[in-house]
Amino acid sequence: MTSSLPATFGALKRSPFGSDGRRGRSVKDELRANLLARIGDGKPLFPGVLGYEDSVMPQMVNALLSRHHFILLGLRGQAKSRILRALTTLLDPALPVIAGSEVNDDPFAPISKFGRERVREAGDDTPIEWLAPDQRYVEKLATPDVTVADLIGDLDPIKAARGGHLLSDELTIHFGMLPRAHRGIFALNELPDLAGKVQVGLFNVMQEGDVQIKGYPVRLALDVLLAFTANPEDYTARGKIITPLKDRIGSEILTHYPATVDLAMAITEQEAWTARDGLPVRLPDVVAEVTERVAFEARAEKRIDQRSGVSQRLSITLLENVVSNAERRAVRLGEREIVPRLADVYAALPAITGKIELEYEGELIGGAVIARELIRRAADATLTERDDTLDLDEIVMWFDRGQALQVSDDASAKVAREGFATVPGLLEIVTASALGVNDDADAVVACELVLEAPVARRKLSRSESGQYGRSARRKHGMPPERPEREE
C-alpha cells in the first residue's frame, strides 16, 4: 500500500479511517455504501459481466442492499464465479488490520487473542498493515473431502509446541478459511458437494455471525459476507443442501445463458483470445456468428443432456480453435492476414465434443457426428437470418447429377474460390446476396455458408473430409428432411 496510509494505531485514530463513520463498519455496510455510490454515479456495477443487466444484476443489487448472504444458481459457464470475484470492486481500496494477524483483526475491535494482546501491549504503537480488496476475498471449491477444520479451524499441536503454549491456549488455534476471511468475502463454489455435517458448521456464521472452534470455549465474532454457487440440479433434485442452511441464505439468484446471439457474440469477443501475436486477424462476421450459433443449437439438441448445460466456454474455445486453424494455414501459405472460414469450424471439433454431455441416444451416434450436425444447423440458421431469399435449387440439381466438390481447408483463398467457381451459379449467388463479398476470402466464406445450408436440410451431403455431394436420401429417391431439434 502507499506510504501515506497510517502505519500505527495512534496515527490511524487521528486519520479519517478512525472516524465514527468508518470505525466498526461491517463489510456488508461497506459493500452497501459503495454500491449505492456506484449506482448514483451511473458506473457499471460489475465490469466485464454482460447480459445480466435486466435479470441477475437487479437481484444482486437488492441482495447486497439488504445485507444478505446469497447463492447464485446456474448451469456451468454462466459467469457465476466471475460475478463473485467482481464483488471486490465494491470494497474499499484499503483496509487497516493489525500487523501479523491471521484473521485480519480490526485494531479498534480485535477478535483474536493475538490481536487483543498486541493492542494491549503496544497501544498506539501497534503496527498497522493494509489490505487491498483482492486480499479480502477468499474462495473455496466445495468437495466431499472438505472438513469443518478446513473451514472453521482446529487445534495445532505444532504451534503449541513451538510457542510453549498449553493446548487449551487460544494461541494454539489453527484458523480455517472462514476466520481468515474476517472483514471480507467468503465464496464457496458448488455448495451441494459440501458434506452435510460441514454445512452445519456454517449455521452460526450466517445467523449469529460467529464461529466456535472445536475444543475451545471461545467465540469469534466474524464479520463476513457469504456467497455461494450451485447447479440447480444439485440444489433442487438431489437435495444436497440441508434445509436449515437453505433457510439462512437470504437471496437465491438464478443465472442464465445469453438470450440472443448478438449478446453471446459480444461475450465471446470479450473473452476469446483472437488477437494473435503474429499476423493480423480478420474474423468474418459470418464465421463468428456460426461459431456462436453452435452453442445455441446445442442448447436445443435433445440428444445433449440439457441438465448439465452447454457452457459459454464452448463458443469461446471453439472460436479460439477456429482462429488457430486459420493461423496455421496462413503461416504455411505465407499469407498476410489470418481469415477464418467455415471449414475451420469443422477443424475445431475437439472444442465442441469435450463440452457436451450426451444422452443415451447421443452416445449411440457419437459426439463428433452430433457436433457436425450442430455446425451445419448453425450455418443454416445464419444464412436464413442474413438472406432467406436465395434460390439454391440449381446448385442442388448440379450435385444431384452426380457432381462433387472437394475444397481443402488448407487451400489458399484464391484456390478455394476457384474450386467453388466450378459449381454453376454459386459465385453469382453469393455475389448478389447480402453476405458482403469484397475479396476472395469473403467469397470463400459465403460459398461455404451457401453450401452448408442444403447440407443441414439434407439436400446435399458433406463428408468428414469436406467433400460436398449428392444427399444419400435423394440418391435413393427419398424426400429431404430437416433434422429434428428440440424447441
Q: Could you describe each region identified by the protein language model?
A:
Residues E292-F296:
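Acidic-glycine-rich active-site phosphate/pyrophosphate-binding loop
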Residues T2-D262, W273-E289, K302-Q306, A379-E487:
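Conserved ASCE/P-loop NTPase catalytic core
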Residues D277-P284, E297-A371:
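C-terminal helical "lid" subdomain and adjoining coupling/linker elements of P-loop NTPases
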Residues G362-T389:
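C-terminal catalytic subdomain
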